[in-house]
Amino acid sequence: METELDDERDGEVVVVGGGVIGLTTAVVLAERGRRVRLWTREPAERTTSVVAGGLWWPYRIEPVALAQAWALRSLDVYEELAARPGQTGVRMLEGVLGETGLDEVDGWAAARLPGLRAASAAEYAGTGLWARLPLIDMSTHLPWLRERLLAAGGTVEDRAVTDLAEADAPVVVNCTGLGARELVPDPAVRPVRGQLVVVENPGIHNWLVAADADSGETTYFLPQPGRLLLGGTAEEDAWSTEPDPEVAAAIVRRCAALRPEIAGARVLAHLVGLRPARDAVRLERGTLPDGRRLVHNYGHGGAGVTVAWGCAQEAARLAS
């Protein structure tokens, strides 16, 4: 009887962290037959992930080569999920990657992106690429991930932890994002503040992302169901989650310079999220003080959505 109980517990995993990385990792583990409990400090709709613009594209993530591989694995999944956009929140949508040339994607993504081409002058004034990429509506996708986890036999518990050793399972997976700074502790994890403005969509159907080489600012607009997301900012080591009115006005001005109709769009909301940046994603196996297996999966910067499935698959491998 004890042997049967031990065998059953050997299949148990506690995933700590309920953002897109934690949820996706929990789903992959549960669908591979593990008994998964997800512990989350706050509901998914209050995590940093819900503030994400949701465009699939590696942004502020290292190491680049691994991030690209994880992104391509995630692309495979998102392309499948886009067949059910109303349920999953995933759509394949065309738009412009501004200030990006074909040579920058030829080595890793060009073969996987049908229709990738140089943007025309009418589509973008500078050098840019016209691409069809996954755009994920996080307000739909996160609840869908939760339901998929529950359907696979997993459970979700609202629970804050101060020590990873509190997790009572043979395997613990740490997907705490910025929380890893204190929980591990890992001082290499730091916030990169992002602010967005949500407006009524004045009729824009394609996304655009453009980085200014001089200022380092990234300007983007992303059409999501019922709204248009405008961005963005990347403030290093900034902890405030209060929207800055001056920053918001500057975001609207930059977006309106590209599409004038944005200037008069009614503002619906202001959002702020703290990206969990690190000099390199930490995706590796370790041990807790009592010898139990610990898998770290955090530090994805501004690309958590982009690499979620690839990193989840690797984390599941490390947990086995």
From Swiss-Prot:
EC number: 1.4.3.3
Cofactor(s) the protein requires to work: FAD
Protein's GO biological process: D-amino acid catabolic process
Main subcellular location: cytoplasm
A cellular component term, taken from the record's GO annotations: extracellular region
Gene Ontology MF terms in the entry: D-amino-acid oxidase activity; FAD binding
Enzyme class: oxidoreductase
Inducers of expression: Not induced when D-valine is added to the growth medium.
Binding site for D-proline: 220, 275, 302
Keyword Cytoplasm: yes
Matches recorded under Pfam families: DAO
Compartment(s): Cytoplasm; Secreted, Cell wall
Keyword DNA damage in annotation: no
Binding annotation for FAD: 18-21, 47-49, 53-55, 161, 176, 275, 301-302, 304, 306
InterPro entries tied to this protein: D-amino_acid_oxidase_CS, DAO, FAD-dep_OxRdtase
Keywords: Cell wall, Cytoplasm, FAD, Flavoprotein, Oxidoreductase, Secreted
Phenotypic effect of disruption: Knockout does not appear to have a significant effect on the assimilation and detoxification of D-valine.
Binding locations of D-serine: 220, 275, 302
Function: Catalyzes the oxidative deamination of D-amino acids with broad substrate specificity.
PANTHER family in the cross-refs: D-AMINO ACID OXIDASE (PTHR11530), D-ASPARTATE OXIDASE (PTHR11530:SF11)
Similarity field: Belongs to the DAMOX/DASOX family.
Name this protein carries in UniProt: D-amino-acid oxidase
Underlying gene: dao
